[in-house]
Amino acid sequence: MASHVIVKFITAAILIGSCYANYCDQSLCRRGPHVACNAPTQFGSACGQEPKFVKMDARMKNLLLKKHNELRAEIACGKHGFPQAARMPTLVWDDELAHIASFNARKCIFAHDKCRNTREFKFAGQNLAITAFAGYNFQAADRAENFTQEWFNEHKDCPKSYVDSYPMSHSGPQIGHFTQMVNDRAWKMGCSMVHYKNGRVIKYYLVCNYSMTNMIEEPIYTRGSAGSKCQTGQNPQYRGLCSPREKVRSESYRG
């Protein structure tokens, strides 16, 4: 039987729980409607047959966080030719960011939403990935880990000078997923994943939202001895990252 896999990635740069904000509040968004404003709760027509959410249980959350933080720590410690990061926080899970990600995921359309901000995070970022395959027995955990690694692998094409100033424009292979992953003003993340079918083809679509996005002409992270500016100490599990208690301001330096 013929087997094939197609994977696509996309990243964003800036730019229905009752316990969450009014997402139709125009003060949340500068660039268009919020993805969760008056959004349908059912799956979209693009979701093919048998669409369902992958359960973001403790195992899946930990897998995504562990993979992200392992790779962030590599950059924080100066691997792959990048400068060390003075204050790279450990990413922790945020249920609201994950909740908002579900509104994009349930459309099954591989495209960024225009706005995914929260009251706390006014510059939320986003990474997307989708895969289509037939003849394989991939599981959600396999795909989530693979997506994250592929995002990170963009470091091979990312000029080191971008660390100090994210460019207005970039030509060449994608680098935005990688820069989103290692942004030192991102300290929270939340993801949603959908599994569905189109005939014999099986698809997984992953949406991860982050507390901060790539800001044009601003640093991706601050150079310095690894962890030297952490205010709560370093994470013993992920050397070079600040402890999980480290909270940073997910804001533009321009205010």
Swiss-Prot record:
Known function: Activates autophagy in human monocytic cells, dendritic cells and macrophages. Promotes activation of human CD4(+) T-cells. Does not affect cytokine expression in human monocytic cells. (Microbial infection) Promotes dengue virus type 2 replication in human monocytic cells, dendritic cells and macrophages. Pro-viral properties are linked to BECN1-mediated autophagy activation in the host. Does not directly interact with the purified envelope protein of dengue virus type 2.
Family stated for the protein in its record: Belongs to the CRISP family.
Keyword Secreted attached: yes
Origin superkingdom: Eukaryota
Glycosylation sites: N146, N209
Signals that turn on the gene: (Microbial infection) Infection with dengue virus or Zika virus does not affect expression.
Compartment annotation: Secreted; Host endosome; Host mitochondrion
Other observations noted: Patients with dengue virus or Zika virus infections during the acute or early convalescence phase have higher levels of IgG serum antibodies against the protein.
SMART domains, A to Z: SCP (SM00198)
Source species of the chain: Aedes aegypti (Yellowfever mosquito)
InterPro entries: CAP_dom (IPR014044), CAP_sf (IPR035940), CRISP-related (IPR001283), P14a_insect (IPR034763), V5_allergen-like (IPR002413)
Signal sequence, renumbered to the chain: 1-21
PANTHER family on file: CYSTEINE-RICH SECRETORY PROTEIN-RELATED
Tissue occurrence: Saliva (at protein level). Female salivary gland. No or low-level expression in female hemolymph, midgut, Malpighian tubule system and ovary. No or low-level expression in male tissues.
Primary subcellular site in the record, as a coarse category: secreted
UniProt subunit comment: Interacts with human LRPPRC; the interaction interrupts association between BECN1 and LRPPRC. Interacts with human CD4.
Protein keywords: Glycoprotein, Host endosome, Host mitochondrion, Secreted, Signal
Phenotype of the disrupted gene, per the record: (Microbial infection) RNAi-mediated knockdown results in reduced enhancement of dengue and Zika virus infections in human dendritic cells and macrophages after the treatment with salivary gland extracts. Lower viremia and better survival in mice bitten by mosquitoes transmitting Zika virus. No significant effects on Zika virus load in the mosquito salivary glands.
Keyword Signal carried by entry: yes
Annotated protein name in UniProt: Venom allergen-1
GO cellular component, one term: host cell mitochondrion
Residue ranges of every copy of the SCP domain listed in the record: 65-210
